[in-house]
């Protein structure tokens, strides 16, 4: 944490030094008031004065004559001077130097205090922000890790709803198809076409082998089918050899009405499945 906050601390320290230097350059030393050689009181002033350069921030000269300059060698030590004590205060209406009210405060001191407080506020705020970021970062990582799972869950919900919608539409389509097929079955059916599975088999062999032929007989070659018929025909029971397979279409019988059509408010119901002829003979299948 301190390594991450070190650039901010360095930046704050540099800004503090620049503010101090700017305050020092803008307001130099304060030359206290003094009595000149003619015993005339001279008021104190802040360096630099109006007619001095920006670099004249040092109080120079002698105790009897003070001025602002930029040379550190010519600096005046005002602590050793004793002519800055005002004499004849009632005449000039000026307090004495030793009195509490005569303490001269440099002008740059308030600016220095304000600048130091501002820089300290920046440093403290930066440290608090770094600590908060370090403390809250582990709590945000699990939330980000859980975010893809929630996104996948949100993605699956529309898929489920679309699947249920498609199932509902398919069920409606199937019911519509069933109703249309039932209405179509009410009419007469055309006779079914004869399958061409017996493409190259004689009729006598087909009549004898019809009861024990597999369902996928059509995929066999004609020569192989003939051999299979001749081979299986030897094992047929003599009791079922004379039976023939009916190839004619099954006659349709009229469907009885389940609800009387004379009653008001009801439609005539028709059975979707045709009734089989009870007189049709059923031949049992024989497997060897």
Curated annotation (Swiss-Prot):
PANTHER family: PROTEIN SHISA-2 HOMOLOG, SHISA
Listed Low complexity bias regions: 161-188
Main location: endoplasmic reticulum
A biological process from GO: negative regulation of fibroblast growth factor receptor signaling pathway
Ranges where the record places region Disordered: 161-198
Source species, domain of life: Eukaryota
Membrane-crossing segments per the record: 111-131
CC terms in the record's Gene Ontology section: endoplasmic reticulum; endoplasmic reticulum membrane
Family: Belongs to the shisa family.
Quaternary structure (record): Interacts with fzd8 and fgfr1.
Protein name per its UniProtKB record: Protein shisa-2
Misc note: 'Shisa' was named after a sculpture form, common to southern Japan, with a large head similar to the Egyptian sphinx.
InterPro entries membership: Shisa (IPR026910), Shisa_N (IPR053891)
Cellular compartments annotated: Endoplasmic reticulum membrane
Sequence ranges on the Extracellular membrane side: 24-110
Keywords noted in UniProt: Developmental protein, Endoplasmic reticulum, Membrane, Signal, Transmembrane, Transmembrane helix
Residues of the signal peptide: 1-23
Cytoplasmic topological domain: 132-288
Entry membrane topology: Single-pass type I membrane protein
Functional summary from the UniProt entry: Plays an essential role in the maturation of presomitic mesoderm cells by individual attenuation of both fgf and wnt signaling. Inhibits both wnt and fgf signaling through the regulation of protein maturation and cell surface transportation of their receptors within the endoplasmic reticulum.
């Amino acid at each position: 944490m301190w390594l991450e906050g070190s650039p901010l601390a360095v930046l704050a320290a540099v800004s503090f030094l620049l503010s101090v230097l700017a305050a020092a350059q803008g307001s130099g030393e304060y030359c206290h008031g003094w009595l000149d050689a003619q015993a005339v009181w001279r008021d104190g002033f802040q360096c630099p004065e109006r007619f001095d350069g920006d670099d004249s921030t040092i109080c120079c000269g002698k105790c009897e004559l003070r001025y602002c300059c930029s040379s550190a060698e010519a600096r005046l030590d005002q602590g050793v001077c004793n002519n800055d004590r005002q004499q004849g205060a009632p005449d000039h209406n000026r307090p004495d130097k030793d009195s509490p009210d005569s303490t001269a405060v440099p002008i740059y001191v308030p600016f220095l205090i304000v600048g130091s407080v501002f820089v300290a506020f920046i440093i403290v705020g930066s440290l608090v922000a770094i600590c908060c970021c370090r403390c809250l970062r582990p709590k945000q990582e699990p939330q980000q890790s859980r975010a893809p799972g929630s996104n996948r869950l949100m993605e699956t919900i529309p898929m489920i709803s679309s699947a249920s919608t498609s199932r509902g539409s398919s069920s409606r389509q199937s019911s519509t198809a069933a109703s249309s097929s039932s209405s179509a079955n009410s009419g007469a059916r055309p006779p079914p076409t004869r399958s061409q599975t017996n493409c190259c088999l004689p009729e006598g062999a087909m009549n004898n082998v019809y009861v024990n032929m597999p369902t996928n007989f059509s995929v066999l070659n004609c020569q192989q089918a003939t051999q299979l018929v001749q081979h299986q025909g030897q094992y047929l029971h003599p009791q079922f050899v004379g039976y023939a397979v009916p190839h004619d279409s099954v006659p349709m019988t009229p469907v009885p009405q389940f609800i009387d059509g004379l009653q008001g408010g009801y439609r005539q119901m028709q059975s979707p499945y045709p009734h089989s002829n009870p007189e049709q003979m059923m031949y049992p299948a024989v497997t060897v």
